[in-house]
């Protein structure tokens, strides 16, 4: 499924959103985009950077006592505490999201200064956060559920039940596909994915 990209603002490069369900292969596509010379802003990496800053650690420990020990955030403990409680998630997001946005905007400004015409924003919960409205186009990486589960389990750290629970809290793959500008089907070999990606970049006039 494809649709035309929205017009971009003259104050920043065009924004290509990148998202996908757990195990779909979004990280692989992000790597391929970097190999093709595009700047990829990784929302998860920037969120990790933000939560390493002393003032943020202080706020997090005040909001969630005990999650910071010796200046280090217990990420697993924090995730377990907020995961099933929407009010706690909202509290965490209120601390981190404005800072992550500011960080992404600063990196985007640097890309603008380098004369780049497009930047990629790699955001796992792009649709769930309503962030597609700020994108000029959105790539959704998708694959069948069982294949996604197999890949996610191979990474380790999560059980099948954990993965299914996280997946259930996101928009369905079908809804993500419906909202996408272009869908990349990652159910085949890497070469097939690369071919689809290159075709998408040509369609969007990125390369």
UniProtKB/Swiss-Prot annotation:
Which pathway does the database say it acts in? Cofactor biosynthesis; coenzyme A biosynthesis; CoA from (R)-pantothenate: step 5/5
**Single GO MF descriptor:** dephospho-CoA kinase activity
Instruction: Enumerate the SUPFAM superfamilies for this protein.
Output: P-loop containing nucleoside triphosphate hydrolases
Q: Which cysteines are joined by disulfide bonds?
A: none
Q: Does the keyword Kinase apply?
A: yes
Q: Which HAMAP family match?
A: Dephospho_CoA_kinase
Q: Report the protein name in the record.
A: Dephospho-CoA kinase
Which lineage ranks, top first, belong to the organism behind this chain? Answer: Bacteria, Thermotogati, Deinococcota, Deinococci, Deinococcales
